[in-house]
């Protein structure tokens, strides 16, 4: 989101750290409010016989008005967001003839209250968030309750949130928890728990990577500095496991990474991942699940001192494909900045894939072999 109106005062509507995962996180946001939905392309037409060009169907919706109210009374904070979209006129083809169809705009509403107790050096908070997206075709409502705890020592952080969705068709429920424990400086344990049933749908206003999932993710991080032969070292170990509600194990992975920082400000990063056999239940677009083989992935990255006028970065990656074959890539990035006003970068990537599995239609898949060379120059 880059629109100033929706960025200013948005903190009150942030219900958990997952709403903004950050640059170090590989996950996607989980949030009841994604303001980029406001002004997004209009809903699909109910008359499916009208053919729309992609540029026509994906044009943004204009806003009629939007207002935001935020404030605080003692330990109670509150916020209200309302945005109204204008109707969109779409031009398409029906039976070979040009037709015009008007799609009504949506009405977005979000109401938030948060009670915080920050006495001492810790924090305890409980919040409530209600959202509604109104449209002639369907009204979608969501409800979220969030709980937060920060111990006085700062070693324990707990964030819990429940999610509920309700439309005219179905209602869904879910919850997640993030638990962070830092027993000492430079050491962190993080456990995340997920439970999203098959009917949970918050996509009208929010964002959820997928529903029909339950599982956990454990991550160990250790940061060391001022070592005898290194300027710093970071170590990450991750274990992930997920199931769908049919009982199929849809995700299982063991990952390890280490970043070494040398005294000359160069960096070396090593990664190794192992993904045991599991079920893939999404790529077939609702046409069933299929079994993936054991797979390995490894990567090596080396970076020179980026503070110098000339710097470079080398990357090499090897990953096994879903049911056999390999993906191999090598890249080189060069950067030259003689002054603050002039900078030049050149990126070069070479990639080969064998056994690249893609879904065609129904239960049919096809494996491809590919080779690509992608140079990029920026001044």
Report residues per predicted region.
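Surface-exposed, low-hydrophobicity segments enriched in Gly/Pro/acidic/Ser residues
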Residues: 1-242, 365-379
């Amino acid at each position: 989101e880059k629109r100033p109106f929706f960025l200013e005062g948005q903190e009150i509507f942030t219900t958990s750290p997952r709403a903004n995962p950050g640059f170090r996180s590989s996950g996607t946001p989980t949030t009841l409010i994604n303001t980029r939905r406001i002004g997004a392309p209009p809903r699909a037409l109910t008359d499916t016989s009208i053919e729309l060009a992609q540029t026509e169907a994906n044009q943004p919706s204009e806003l009629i008005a939007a207002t935001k109210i935020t404030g605080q009374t003692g330990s109670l904070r509150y916020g209200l967001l309302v945005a109204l979209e204008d109707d969109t006129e779409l031009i398409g083809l029906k039976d070979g003839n040009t037709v015009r169809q008007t799609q009504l705009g949506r009405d977005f509403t979000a109401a938030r209250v948060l009670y915080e107790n920050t006495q001492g050096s810790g924090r305890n908070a409980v919040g409530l968030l209600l959202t509604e997206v109104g449209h002639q075709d369907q009204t979608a409502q969501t409800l979220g309750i969030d709980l937060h705890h920060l111990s006085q020592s700062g070693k324990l952080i707990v964030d819990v949130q429940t999610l509920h969705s309700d439309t005219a068709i179905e209602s869904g429920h879910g919850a997640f928890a993030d638990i962070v424990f830092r027993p000492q400086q430079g050491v962190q344990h993080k456990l995340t728990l997920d439970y999203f049933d098959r009917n949970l749908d918050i996509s009208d206003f929010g964002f959820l990577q997928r529903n029909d999932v339950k599982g956990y993710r454990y991550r160990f991080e250790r940061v060391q500095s001022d070592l005898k032969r290194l300027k710093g070292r970071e170590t990450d170990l991750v274990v992930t496991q997920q199931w769908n509600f049919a009982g199929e194990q849809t995700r299982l992975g063991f990952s390890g990474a280490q970043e070494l920082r040398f005294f000359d400000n160069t960096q070396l990063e090593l990664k190794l991942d192992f993904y045991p056999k599991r079920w893939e239940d999404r790529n077939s677009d609702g046409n069933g699940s299929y079994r993936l083989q054991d797979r390995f992935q490894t990567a090596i990255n080396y970076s020179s001192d980026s503070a110098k006028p000339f710097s470079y970065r080398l990357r090499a990656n090897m990953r096994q494909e879903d049911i056999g074959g390999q993906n191999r890539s090598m890249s080189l990035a060069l950067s030259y900045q003689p002054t603050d006003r002039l900078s030049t970068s050149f990126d070069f990537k070479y990639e080969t894939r064998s056994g690249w599995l893609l879904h065609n239609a129904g239960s049919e898949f096809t494996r491809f072999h590919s080779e690509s060379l992608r140079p990029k120059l920026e001044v």
